[in-house]
């Protein structure tokens, strides 16, 4: 059971959640559905994010999924990541299983289009979300998981200060191969953002 404090300030009104490249924003299910549907149908992008869709997603089903994310449980906060330059949706990031008693939450994210990978969006999304988690939610620890084959993500997480906390052996079955899942975490005093 988690105690629910008063809601923190919205990133929409707080410039601390705007970087040089992206800003955290509220998800707009109507406006964001097309980009989200295209990402959901990209087997490479969804695989790296840990999703394995079993059906194609059209605009309407994407809108419905995004509406579910907006109405997420009290222990979840999801954001859209939009470019500062032209307000284009480039990804999504969220804090899940927020536990205010123990002071921890799980971080999950994806940069949607492969053309946007390696441009610094994911790094900045993570820094802004960690700033929100540690400064607004007053969390002590943020953790995440990734599949062991996602070496690019693990390198980024390590550069940002996440530390390896463990592995779930052969946790993921993908294309006939079993992969470990990697658990990484960061404590508030390890955050440099």
Language-model features, listed with the residues they occupy:
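Solvent-exposed, non-membrane alpha-helical residues enriched in polar/charged side chains
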Residues: 37, 63, 67, 131-134, ...
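Amphipathic alpha-helical recognition patches that constitute DNA-binding helices
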Residues: 23, 35, 106, 124, ...
